[in-house]
Amino acid sequence: MQVILLDKIGNLGSLGDQVNVKAGYARNFLIPQGKAVMATKANVEMFETRRAELEANVAKQLAAAEARAEKVNALEVTIASKSGDEGKLFGSIGTRDIAEAATAAGVEIAKSEVRLPEGALRTTGSFEVSIQLHSEVFATLKLEVVAAE
């Protein structure tokens, strides 16, 4: 299925590219999220007339993400959790806990933006957590996990 991308999408293309994707991916993900439109003749003409406006929107989103990245990079968050001997936590600290702690500290982060490639945190200590604010913008959050009294 031919679609026109309205945003930069990793491993697929950037704004304005006409790409061929599977029908289900287009129908269930790209089109409902406003990241693409079907490549009909009318949509191609509509896109060409709105191209400057869409490029400005993408640039604005990128600038906003970079501004948030500056705040996240400067942020240090501490989470207290119950733990046993040798620093093992009872339970774990996941993406939702990290997002809520960062939001409480003053920087709005969604749990879908938190990247934990090795899974949830299960020990006390200092961690650097990757935050993906935009397809091109990553930030690093300094996280300290301490034992709760």
From Swiss-Prot:
Q: Name one GO molecular function term.
A: rRNA binding
Organism listed in the record: Aliivibrio fischeri (strain ATCC 700601 / ES114) (Vibrio fischeri)
Top-rank taxon: Bacteria
Function as written in the Swiss-Prot or TrEMBL entry: Binds to the 23S rRNA.
Q: Which InterPro entries match?
A: Ribosomal_bL9, Ribosomal_bL9/RNase_H1_N, Ribosomal_bL9_bac/chp, Ribosomal_bL9_C, Ribosomal_bL9_C_sf, Ribosomal_bL9_N, Ribosomal_bL9_N_sf
Asked whether the UniProt record includes Membrane among its keywords, one would answer no
Q: Name one GO cellular component term.
A: ribonucleoprotein complex
What processes does the entry annotate via GO biological process terms? translation
This chain's protein is named Large ribosomal subunit protein bL9
Record carries keyword rRNA-binding: yes
For this chain, the family text in UniProt reads: Belongs to the bacterial ribosomal protein bL9 family.
Keyword annotations for this protein, in alphabetical order, are: Ribonucleoprotein, Ribosomal protein, RNA-binding, rRNA-binding
